[in-house]
Amino acid sequence: MAATLQEILLAPDTRPKVVSDAFALIQQEMAEKSGISAAAVKLAYKTASTFAPGHIQHMINTLLPGMADQLQPFWADFNASGGSAFGDYLAKHGDVASEAMLSVTDARAAASKRPIIYRAYGTVRGGAAKHVQAALPRVGDLVMKYAY
């Protein structure tokens, strides 16, 4: 087993698979969302998808190193504590883990040269933490798939 999430998730033969699985995870999360706040998230997702086909996959690939960096402290603590399900571990640390992940997207959105993307992100950022928290068990499962 590699020591860090960077080594695990960013390995040249693994990274494309991680991106593909993360895209599938996002699609599954979108399909299961309902309610008022979900409508805004779905609209932002559709805007990004329609504005530039393949943009979501490109952004997953672009954001992956930052996500690995932000999740690394959780991964290290999970391993040190002898945990068996990283998704459960992330869910228990949902507030902090979701904000760590969102710090990566916040920085990327702020640096975007595409105003429509930045505006779409801005409309959903306020409620994003709860959506990220809901996805943490699946995120952890995705990491575990490649870690072991």
Descriptions of predicted regions:
Residues A100-A147:
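Amphipathic alpha-helical binding modules
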